[in-house]
């Protein structure tokens, strides 16, 4: 089964508290969400493989390290996932970006896919799937399956806030995908929202209702 990890770095926890506050405005929410994403990706990429190469500095030749293995791509689940992309790209500017569009039926809480656009070499990349909220797990599972159908074999899911129900659902359906969260909250309410959560991440990111 894929591992589930809460990233307890003090800066991540502090910044998450700032955007949980209902008084945080759109600008503040958007900026801090990207800051958290950047910190989280810094943490989850600690295990990336390195290889030795020879380079020449102004002082002479030397053997140094560079990233090896698969290249990276970030895949936001639209629309809220867009609010984490810039933070990831600040840390990994060469990463390709794919997009998966999902919307949730407010009555059934079931996800529906409406858009998928991926780099052509998706099977050769380590994918970082980003979405602020992991609630029921339906959207995450549908996104993961869409990526697998297109050849993806290496994926990590990065979320700001997770509910136990969503973690269990993703681990049951996709045990090969590791999940990273800034927080594991208490439960889902009757409307499928995470409690205490941070509200509707998409609306808070883009100033909509």
Curated annotation (Swiss-Prot):
Catalysed reactions, semicolon-separated: UMP + diphosphate = 5-phospho-alpha-D-ribose 1-diphosphate + uracil
Activation/inhibition comment: Allosterically activated by GTP.
Binding positions for 5-phospho-alpha-D-ribose 1-diphosphate per the UniProt entry: 79, 104, 131-139, 200
Biological pathway: Pyrimidine metabolism; UMP biosynthesis via salvage pathway; UMP from uracil: step 1/1
Enzyme Commission number(s) of this protein: 2.4.2.9
One Pfam family matching this protein: UPRTase
Enzyme class: transferase
Cofactor requirement: Mg(2+)
Full protein name: Uracil phosphoribosyltransferase
Species in which this protein is naturally found: Lacticaseibacillus paracasei (strain ATCC 334 / BCRC 17002 / CCUG 31169 / CIP 107868 / KCTC 3260 / NRRL B-441) (Lactobacillus paracasei)
Gene expressing this chain: upp
């Amino acid at each position: 089964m894929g591992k589930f990890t809460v990233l307890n770095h003090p800066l991540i926890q502090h910044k998450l508290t700032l955007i949980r506050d209902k008084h945080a405005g759109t600008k503040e929410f958007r900026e801090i969400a990207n800051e958290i994403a950047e910190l989280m990706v810094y943490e989850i990429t600690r295990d990336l493989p390195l290889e030795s190469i020879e380079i020449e500095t102004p002082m002479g030749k030397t053997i140094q390290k560079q990233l090896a293995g698969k290249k990276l791509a970030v895949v936001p689940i639209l629309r809220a996932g867009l609010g984490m992309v810039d933070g990831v790209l600040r840390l990994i500017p060469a990463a390709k970006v794919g997009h998966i569009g999902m919307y949730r039926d407010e009555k059934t809480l079931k996800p529906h896919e409406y858009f998928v656009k991926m780099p052509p070499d998706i099977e050769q990349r380590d994918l970082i799937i980003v979405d602020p909220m992991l609630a029921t797990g339906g959207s995450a599972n549908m996104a993961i399956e869409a990526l697998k159908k297109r050849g993806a074999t290496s994926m990590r899911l990065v979320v700001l806030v997770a509910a136990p129900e969503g973690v269990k659902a993703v681990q049951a359906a996709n045990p090969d995908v590791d999940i990273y969260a800034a927080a594991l909250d208490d439960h889902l309410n009757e409307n499928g929202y995470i409690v205490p959560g941070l509200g509707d991440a998409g609306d808070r990111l883009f100033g909509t209702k």
